[in-house]
Amino acid sequence: MRLLHVIGIGAGDPDQVTVAAVKAMNEVDVFVLIDKGSAKQELVDVRTRILDEHMRRPHRVVEFVDPPRDRTPRDYDAAVDTWHDARARALGDLLDAEPDDAVGGMLVWGDPSLYDSTLRVVDRVRARLDDPFEVRVTPGVTSPSALAAAHGTVLNRVGEPVLTTTGRRLREDGVPDGVDAVVVMLDSDCGFLALPDWHVHWGANLGTPDAVVLAGRVSDVGEEIVRVRADLRRRAGWVMDTYLVRRPLGR
């Protein structure tokens, strides 16, 4: 393989795919999708719908099975490193089977730069090659952008910083001094519940027919979000959620 396009496709709506992304997609001979199991088949189906909508040239789609990951590790960083290494081996084996002049493509939810491991895994694949393929990255609409649009709001007040972090860090470290707005993605434990006086804008599976959004004071809507999130996981088989929590004015 001579070239791999890593293409951000937004939150799942084919209409969110940028013109630049469509142009990059139409240079691709073979798209690589990660099979995450039957419970998350819709994640593959969304990518397939995007290809059906935007591709104008012959192409193939190949899949590799996502290696298992320890979800309750003693050492979180080490567990993720092991998982990324297994992903890199699986992806490398698949790309090795393609012709030397082939152009590959990987469709990344949201934007490849934010809360996604694709580029890290691709770097590991390239590091093992004597003559590594070229990588070109096309940005996409991020889930925080899609969240803000769905709620018709902005992420920050005037002159206000925004912290983007994980649910785990929010639970363990709390909110740093001087931070009044926090964006979190993929938080199954709903860490915002620890901030009952703050205001939350929450959304899940944005850009898909199952999209849900809720907003309000955490003490008023927090438990409803927990229930809605659990119900969505039962119905759809997966949840990708994002939320913005903001400190009340004057606090």
Regions found by a protein language model. Name each.
Residues N26, D96, A149, D177, ...:
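Alpha-helix boundary recognition
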Residues M1-E134, A215, D220-E223, R233-R251:
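Class I S-adenosyl-L-methionine
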Residues L33, E63, M106-V108, V137-G140, ...:
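General beta-strand structural signal in soluble alpha/beta enzymes
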Residues D81-R87, L107-S117, A149-N156, V182-L195:
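Short secondary-structure transition/capping segments
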Residues L4, D173-R251:
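A contiguous loop/helix-start segment that scaffolds small-molecule binding in enzyme catalytic cores
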Residues W109-V179, R234-A236, R251:
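Class I SAM-dependent methyltransferase SAM-binding "motif I" and its flanking Rossmann-like core
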Residues A11-G12, K36-A39, E160-L163, G167-L170, ...:
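Short, acidic/turn-prone active-site loops that include or flank metal/cofactor-
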Residues S38-Q41, T142-S145, R171, G191-F192, ...:
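Short gly/pro/ser/thr-enriched loop/turn and capping motifs at secondary-structure boundaries
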